[in-house]
Amino acid sequence: MRPSDGPGITVVGIAKEFESLVDCLYNCGDYDMQATIIETLLRYTTRSVRHKMASAWFPNYVKLQSLFLGIKDFESDCRTFLGHFNEGLSDKKQVWSYPMMFCTVEGRSLVKPEDLAEFWVDFNFGPGTVSFYYVFKVNNTTETICI
């Protein structure tokens, strides 16, 4: 996934829809939904629009704005951004993410995706799930287990 660099959508007229997405980012309580929202914001805005809107979307948190604007390698950079984002929510936090040393399901060891620095497990209080990504060795694709 690459952020949009083309003409994209202007801020005028669509800003409210993006604000609704950002509100959902703060309240959905689900890592996968949060990652999808970030991907949407990156795909449907130009770099210049993101620079203009980052301070409105993530007010009073310059590091978070910088992490958002610095997303290049989506999987790892988004994971870093959302880790800081969720930690910053303190008592309103609904997603807890922790690195795992290993994961075994029904006696089978699962393999960490190569594009992630660590093997993460997400506790999502919005939908009440636990999820993690792993590599499915049969076809070498990244899959998600959601409990």
Regions found by a protein language model. Give the residues of each.
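N-terminal recruitment modules of adaptor/scaffold proteins
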Residues: 65-147
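Helix N-cap and loop-to-helix transition residues
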Residues: 3-4, 30, 146
